[in-house]
Amino acid sequence: MKDNQTLYRYEFKYLVNEKVSEQIKGNVIKFMNVDEFARKMNSNSYFVSSIYFEDDFNTNFTEKIDGNKIRKKFRIRNYSKDLNNDPIFLEVKGRNLDRTFKKRTKIDYEDIITINNRRNINSLLKKYPNNDIINQFIFELYKKNLKPKIIVNYSRTPFANSQGLYFRLTFDKEISSDFLPVIMCGKMVKDSIGIVTIRGSNMNVLKKMSL
């Protein structure tokens, strides 16, 4: 995914136990490939960590639970347990009616400290000139008094369609979360429960592939 490029897609999520997840994975691997990034890992999976921002009223959480069709949220995401050795992204993700969208830009570890301390945040505007995500994030940060509220970690095994339309299937497990400022893996959601997510650019194809 290119920097500052908006990706639109349809998305369906399912809670499944480990047995069902492995059964689906066994069938999927017959006609889909593990994505290029995950193939570099021994287990065909990679670590994902996301820090989510919220206002004082937990509006993002409430809108998600209520199923609002128009919503968005900001998060910091990386794919390694060592922030100093891995790309870090500031992302905005949301929903516009039936489709979800995601847009991201690469940032540095020092920027996370700047955001967390809320000191000299405007320096990011000079560091990343004409960056839509940075501009939007800082505006929302001040307007809604956004703060990093929760961190979510998990292991992801992704499959991608090698030909034709954009189609992606991911299996997430070992899901844990904790409230900030405690930045560490904390409360395990449940060992045997995972999330299967189907994403794609064509609604008709996704309906046929849905569980």
PLM feature segments, named:
Residues M1-L211:
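Phosphate-end processing signature that detects enzymes handling 5′-triphosphorylated RNA
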